[in-house]
């Protein structure tokens, strides 16, 4: 996916939450990543801390955007864990399951 500005097709939508599913191509460092000044790791993935948060306060990342190309099961597990940290960040605590950590590596 590549997002490009097109003056004739611009739309603005109010939203409480925006989720991007990036698939296998990784983050496009020329668009939203650049606009929000999101830091990337040495592999070109969105850098995140141990709580799934990027360098932008309140912006969390899970799945391929943070891990790099991987299996859907990793994206699902990371999404669940990330949701628990988002819940905790918003509510001050969470009872949601958190099956994996941001730096957990698959066995090879």
Where are these regions (language model features)?
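FAD-site-proximal beta/loop scaffold in flavoenzymes
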Residues: 4-69
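Mid-to-C-terminal Rossmann-like scaffold of FAD/NAD(P)H-dependent oxidoreductases
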Residues: 8, 91-108
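Non-catalytic alpha-helical coupling and interface elements of nucleotide-dependent molecular machines
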Residues: 20-23, 27, 81-91, 95
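Solvent-exposed, non-transmembrane amphipathic alpha-helical segments
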Residues: 35-39, 52, 82, 99-106
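Short, surface-exposed, polar/charged, turn-prone segments marking secondary-structure boundaries
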Residues: 45-49, 87-90, 101-104
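A conserved FAD-binding loop/helix module that cradles the flavin
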Residues: 65-90
């Amino acid at each position: 996916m590549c997002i490009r500005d097109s003056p004739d097709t611009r739309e603005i939508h109010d939203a409480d939450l925006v989720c991007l599913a990036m698939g296998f191509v990784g983050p496009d460092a020329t668009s939203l990543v650049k606009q929000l000044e999101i830091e990337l790791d040495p592999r070109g993935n969105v850098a995140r801390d141990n709580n799934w948060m990027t360098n932008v306060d309140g912006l969390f990342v899970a799945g391929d955007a943070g891990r790099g190309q991987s299996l859907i099961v990793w994206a699902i597990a990371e999404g669940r864990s990330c949701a628990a940290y988002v819940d905790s960040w918003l509510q001050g605590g969470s009872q949601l399951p958190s099956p994996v950590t941001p730096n957990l590596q698959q066995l090879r």
